[in-house]
Regions:
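A short beta-strand motif characteristic of beta-propeller blades
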Residues: 31-37, 75-84, 121-123, 128-134
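Blade-level signature of beta-propeller repeat domains, shared across WD40, Kelch, NHL, RCC1
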Residues: 145-171
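Blade-loop segments of beta-propeller domains
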Residues: 1-44
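Structural signal for beta-propeller blades
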Residues: 21-22, 62-64, 108-109, 161-163
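Loop/turn-rich, solvent-exposed surfaces of beta-rich toroidal or solenoidal domains
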Residues: 84-118
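Beta-rich, blade/repeat-based domains predominating
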Residues: 1-9, 39-51, 57, 83-95, ...
Length: 171
């Protein structure tokens, strides 16, 4: 099934979870114009871009760099803290020169330096889950979108009945 999306150069790039390939669509017609196979990464979880290249997560600690023209993986960095690697990187967003990555089954979003993989901060969204309607199918934090005009982040989760717009403030 479909996973991460990113828009770059009038194209929509979409990942598939376990099918080992991505899809490319024309941003205006929404027609599929291309497919691409994953390289060393085996799954597709999250996708973002910096205006030049694409960054892809596969559920591991790696962030893969994709060339938007050839769609080849051209390297990677490992996300890490001073205690070790940070695994289960999921949905990605590019925010002011950093990669925001939620971690599967966690309530936080890591702020990652894309040049070296260093985790520079973690945003704790645990309190948001207390504001959604409780039900048996309620699941994890698992969706983000950044609005550069308002500098806000939209955050939600699987089977959540609310979408939160938050502004990140540094202390």
């Amino acid at each position: 099934f479909g996973e991460g999306l990113s828009v770059l150069n009038d194209k929509i790039y979409q990942l598939t979870w376990r099918e080992g390939r991505g899809l490319v669509y024309d941003v205006n017609s929404l027609e599929q114009i291309e497919t691409f196979n994953y390289g060393q990464s085996k799954e597709g979880w999250g996708l973002c871009n910096d205006g030049k290249k694409l960054y892809k997560s596969d559920g591991s600690e790696f962030l893969w760099f994709l060339n938007p023209i050839t769609l080849a993986e051209e390297g990677s960095v490992q996300a890490y803290t001073n205690k070790g690697k940070l695994t289960n990187l999921n949905e990605l967003e590019w925010v002011d020169g950093k990669i925001y990555a939620n971690r599967y089954q966690k309530n936080g979003v890591a702020i990652i330096n894309p040049n070296n993989g260093a985790i520079e901060a973690v945003i704790d969204f645990k309190a948001l889950k207390t504001k959604v309607t409780k039900h048996q199918g309620l699941d994890v934090l698992n969706g983000m979108a950044y609005n550069p005009q308002t500098k806000t982040l939209f955050v939600t989760g699987k089977r959540w009945d609310k979408l939160f717009e938050v502004r990140i403030i540094e202390n």
